[in-house]
């Protein structure tokens, strides 16, 4: 029996079958995916085959080939990955300038990972109602930067339902992963787009100005007009996984473009003579923040680097 994984609680998977039923399934203890060292071998968005034993317990017996997936380093196991979702048409990364602040390093790590796994990304700048003049100016500068690179952006106040109609229209007919730091208003945005869901929303920790998780498990929700939203727990850091040093520049669109003009084919864009990328940074043709993110990702082989809350 074939079905779509619509919720993952860690020990159980909720699967929607082709005949419209939803069945709670387990996976056998030895179930593993070839080539992927993951804390969760099955992810929301996966198409699977299920079998039901004589006691009526359903098991996932097989996972079908994925169109794509997006992955990050597991937060507690440095040698393993965590699959955020599978079979995506796009990701939407929710960004906040304050309350809490989303760093450009976090944004760029997410974008580079999505590029590596061939998943298009759009950015949602949320909580626009809370920003002062300086915050708004900085937000607009980031929107100009990422739009120029090739990442469409939305300006939204999910709490006040401003800009949410444009986001909702863009979701129609697509399977979309919603992601972002803890506390950026992901659940509030889903409530604005899909009011029937009434997801729990949380407060911001005063001590660290970081969000506290309100989504505990990954779950998929249908969108009016077709398509699905995949809601995942908020992320405090985004560690890359299985990305070789020489590959990192390929996943920064503008760095990859200028690297074709470097003197050396194996240029790392750090210290080599004749580096077209560093020349472009000095001429402000490549954003300094993007170049800083690139250098930061080159250091990911260092022990424990992924733990930092970027």
UniProtKB/Swiss-Prot annotation:
Cofactor note text: Binds 1 zinc ion per subunit.
Record-level GO cellular component terms: cytoplasm
Entry superkingdom: Bacteria
Keyword presence, Transmembrane helix: no
Subcellular location: Cytoplasm
Annotated Zn(2+) binding sites: 262, 267, 269, 275
Required cofactor(s): Zn(2+)
Gene Ontology terms describing biological process: ribosomal small subunit biogenesis
SUPFAM superfamilies found in the cross-reference section: Nucleic acid-binding proteins, P-loop containing nucleoside triphosphate hydrolases
Entry function: One of several proteins that assist in the late maturation steps of the functional core of the 30S ribosomal subunit. Helps release RbfA from mature subunits. May play a role in the assembly of ribosomal proteins into the subunit. Circularly permuted GTPase that catalyzes slow GTP hydrolysis, GTPase activity is stimulated by the 30S ribosomal subunit.
Subunit: Monomer. Associates with 30S ribosomal subunit, binds 16S rRNA.
Protein name (database record): Small ribosomal subunit biogenesis GTPase RsgA
The gene coding this protein: rsgA
